[in-house]
Amino acid sequence: MRQIFPADPAGPEIGQAVPGETGAAVPPAVVALAGLYAYPAAGTRPEPWLRANMVASADGAASLAGRSGGLSGAADRLVFSVLRSLADVILVGASTARVERYRPVAGREIWAALRNGRAPTPPIAVVTRELGLDPDGPLLAGAPPEARTIVLTTAAAPAARRAAAARHAEVVVAGPDRLTPATIIGALAERGYRRLLTEGGPSLLTQFNEAGLLDDLCLTISPVLEGGWAGRIHAAPAAADQGGPAGPGAAAGPGTAARLRLAHVLEDDGSLLCRYLRGTS
């Protein structure tokens, strides 16, 4: 893996590493990536700071054979683990959690030395308007006590579902009948989470962007032409299960274009790993 923007002809290749292979030691590749992807220092950034991590094919598809994991390579997986290691909490929509078969973050998947005294692993926070989750599935029931899964839902969710989820997870009612980007972020901020990482899906990313709350986009462009019917990372319709501002079943309009500033580009085996910051300066 090498940095191609900003250009640094004298810079070394970043290399590769796999969590868990080197014990407590942090390989040079991870140190370099942690610096490139560091959250802005406290006092110099909006708080909380919302980062998204997404992957797309060269022709813009957000998934391959129905899952984003089909577009991921070794470099993307390494950055994925570093971003998770740096985050306070990982935010995901319920439909994405189901399709991608989310589980709690395992210690072997991240770099504990990057946690800086926080819980060994970041919790997963799931956004679900109607709480259509398996209360006894691994995502809720398998989380460790220090990083219990957080379920962000509404007062309109069936009481029996809320009670079932609360057996294992922290259930947070963050709205009467829908969840807005501001209430989602506010609920996490109230619990001390400042460095937020969302992994989508596209509907959730769209809502945060159109609310003006997305600060940072990490996008891997995979050297693949999908050529099918997969959607883009920034979706038009609002997913009903995620309680989007547009409401269940409503199609969004043309949306709000957000200007982004390119912070860096890494290249590895044809994959481009880009980081964009909101704004132009």
Regions found by a protein language model. Give the residues of each.
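Enzymes that bind and transform nitrogen-containing heteroaromatic metabolites
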Residues: 1-281
